[in-house]
């Protein structure tokens, strides 16, 4: 009886300790998602006839050393990427770097439809955002540039070639749209246990079919891809031939291109080598592949 009593007491104590530990773990990271020490300013700008709404987050003292203009990856992202950006933004703010991010076209308070945009459209939008920030910090030492992820790899090079950012940071970007699709699908087939020979044949067949629909002389017939919504089909039609190769050597400002060696979306080895080759004449370039890191 006494042993049973103590076992119940110990079990209850263990449960309380577990709950307390979980509460401590989760609440200790809540500050990563709050901007209590930041100064927030709502800003709007116009691109391609769309009014776009965003937020400029400033360090608590209101005087940043730099401003990072955020370029989203794929998907219907708001200015905070459904709060997924918040820990990163707080890290930048703690380092004295302000952040400007806006709702994608048609998301949140922004007009338009992001699925109707080409990568060139997105680059034009990025330049408009950069120009707005540069006007706010004219005749100051504040450094202003781009910071983007994944699909931003097709946006930032074009934007940086058309404007004068102080820096560009590209994380997990691909150079060629078709090559990225082949890499991504090839890994999926490998995970399914298909042989290298089968994968090669499947990828060749898919490439030919995609070229027939989305290529330069493709049919552009949405009926041939019933798995896509009309908007998504239009997005792929506009971007299927995207290739950052011509723009990368023309980028202005310092360039930092970063990949994770274990990226399952983008071929880190191939794309980092391409950046090194294309930017070999730019002394203000750094290309890094982090081991044991993903997309």
Q: Can you annotate each of these PLM segments?
A:
Residues 116-137:
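Alpha/beta-hydrolase active-site loop
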Residues 77-88, 104, 269:
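The serine-hydrolase catalytic nucleophile loop
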Residues 251, 257-259:
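Short beta-strand/loop motif that positions the catalytic acidic residue
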Residues 169-250:
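Accessory cap/linker subdomain of secreted extracellular hydrolases
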Residues 89-109:
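Conserved alpha/beta-hydrolase
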Residues 29-62:
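N-terminal cap/lid segment of alpha/beta-hydrolase-fold proteins
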Residues 64-73:
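Short beta-strand element of the alpha/beta-hydrolase
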Residues 253, 267-278:
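Short alpha-helix in the alpha/beta-hydrolase fold that links the catalytic acid
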């Amino acid at each position: 009886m006494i042993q049973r009593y103590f076992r119940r007491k110990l079990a209850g104590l263990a449960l309380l300790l577990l709950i307390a530990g979980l509460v401590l773990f989760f609440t200790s990271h809540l500050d990563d998602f709050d901007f209590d020490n930041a100064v927030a300013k709502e800003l709007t700008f116009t691109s391609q006839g769309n009014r776009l709404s965003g937020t400029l987050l400033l360090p608590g003292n209101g005087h940043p050393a730099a401003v990072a203009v955020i370029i989203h990856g794929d998907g219907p992202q708001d200015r905070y990427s459904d709060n997924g950006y918040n820990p990163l933004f707080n890290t930048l703010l703690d380092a004295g770097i302000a952040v400007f991010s806006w709702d994608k076209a048609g998301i949140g308070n922004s007009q338009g439809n992001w699925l109707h945009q080409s990568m060139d459209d997105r680059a034009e939008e990025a330049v408009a955002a950069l120009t707005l920030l540069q006007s706010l910090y004219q005749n100051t030492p504040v450094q202003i540039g781009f910071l983007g992820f994944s699909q931003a790899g097709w946006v930032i090079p074009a934007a940086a070639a058309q404007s004068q950012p102080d820096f560009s940071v590209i994380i997990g970007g691909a150079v060629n749209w078709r090559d990225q699709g082949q890499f991504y699908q090839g890994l999926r087939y490998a995970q399914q246990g298909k042989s290298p020979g089968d994968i090669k044949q499947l990828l060749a067949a898919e490439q030919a079919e995609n070229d027939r629909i989305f290529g330069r002389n493709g049919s552009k017939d949405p009926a041939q891809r019933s798995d896509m919504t009309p908007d998504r089909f239009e997005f792929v039609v506009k971007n299927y031939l995207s290739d950052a190769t011509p723009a990368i050597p023309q980028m202005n400002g310092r360039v930092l291109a970063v990949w994770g060696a274990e990226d399952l979306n983008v071929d880190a080895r191939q794309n980092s080598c391409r950046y090194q080759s294309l930017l070999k004449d730019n002394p203000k370039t750094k290309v890094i592949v982090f081991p044991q890191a993903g997309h």
